[in-house]
Curated annotation (Swiss-Prot):
GO molecular function, one term: structural constituent of ribosome
Tree of life domain: Bacteria
Family statement drawn from the similarity comment of this UniProt entry: Belongs to the universal ribosomal protein uS9 family.
Protein name: Small ribosomal subunit protein uS9
Gene: rpsI
One cellular-component annotation, GO: cytosolic small ribosomal subunit
Segments for region (Disordered): 1-29
InterPro entries: Ribosomal_Su5_D2-typ_SF, Ribosomal_uS9, Ribosomal_uS9_bac/plastid, Ribosomal_uS9_CS, Ribsml_uS5_D2-typ_fold_subgr
Organism in which the protein naturally occurs: Rhodopseudomonas palustris (strain BisB5)
Length: 158
């Protein structure tokens, strides 16, 4: 600011413009699919979404077959429901590692990221719902001198 101000009216004219929030662009491959990876615990999911009837395929199987528990299927649908896009996209994903709960969380994270790649304007809704945040909680390692991560061996006073 090399100039000096004569009055407070000039203050607004001298303010430098702050850079706007980053703009996100639509990222789609040649087949019209958006791709993203999701992670949770030890599970890693690769997710592709494309406009369709709402069919979800996990490791080349129907979602009802792969995730038999209704809670896990509900977890996968959460980002689509929050974005009001349930039944509008076909989801194809491959998931490996971890257990079923971690895999469902990884697929949910991947669907959320793929939705933002397909429709960047949904980023605010999904971020507010916590779907774009990677859940960094993993199993605590076992320590030597202990039975498990924190549990000590049985202690006898006498």
């Amino acid at each position: 600011m090399s100039e000096t101000m004569q009055s407070l009216d000039q203050l607004s004219a001298l303010k430098t413009t702050q850079p706007d929030a980053p703009t996100y662009t639509k990222k789609v491959d040649k087949q019209g699919r958006a791709y993203a990876t999701g992670k949770r615990k030890d599970a890693v999911a690769r997710v592709w979404i494309k406009p369709g009837a709402g069919k979800v395929t996990v490791n080349a199987r129907e979602v009802e077959v792969y995730f038999a528990r209704p809670v896990l299927r509900m977890m996968i649908q959460q980002p689509l429901v929050a974005a009001a896009r349930a039944g509008q996209y076909d989801v194809i994903c491959t998931v490996a590692g971890g257990g079923l709960s971690g895999q469902a969380g990884a697929v949910r994270h991947g669907i959320s990221k793929a939705l933002t790649n397909f429709e960047p304007e949904l980023r605010g809704v999904l971020k507010k719902g916590g779907f774009l945040t990677r859940d960094s909680r993993v199993v605590e390692r076992k320590k030597y001198g202990k039975a498990k991560a924190r549990r000590s061996f049985q202690f006898s006073k006498r």
